[in-house]
Amino acid sequence: MAIQKAKFSIGDIVKHKHFDFRGVIYDVDFEFNNSEEWYQSIPKNVRPRKDQPFYHLLAENDEITYEADVSEQNLLVDDSDEPIKHPLIEEIFSGKKGSSYFKLSN
């Protein structure tokens, strides 16, 4: 299988194409790396291909914050410039500039 190149980077703020949530990327798997049960739980009309990057997000919607795994095909850049209000942001990232978060080097 060919190595996939990720379209998004750690720290990028993104939004879901089909569902009303957004988040910041904190990790990436370059191909599907979750359970088959999780995969089958995704509605068929938006179920992604497995041969693409999957991003781990600190996510939020109007009601809650949570962590989400989302395929590249279901993500868009979030250009709202609004910060993500997730309680784990400060544990992973040092700050925000424009539409992305960054980590300071150790």
Give the ranges of each region predicted by the language model.
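Mixed-charge, Lys/Arg-rich low-complexity intrinsically disordered regions
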Residues: 1-13, 18-22, 29-32, 103-106
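Intrinsically disordered, low-complexity segments enriched in polar/charged residues with Gly/Pro
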Residues: 1-3, 43-45, 88-89
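Short, solvent-exposed secondary-structure boundary/capping segments
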Residues: 32-41
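Surface loops and adjacent helix of pleckstrin homology
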Residues: 26-28, 69
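Short amphipathic alpha-helical leader/targeting segments
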Residues: 25-26, 37
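Generic alpha-helix detector with strongest preference for long hydrophobic helices that associate
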Residues: 4-6, 38, 73-74
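Intrinsically disordered, low-complexity boundary segments flanking structured domains
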Residues: 12, 41-46
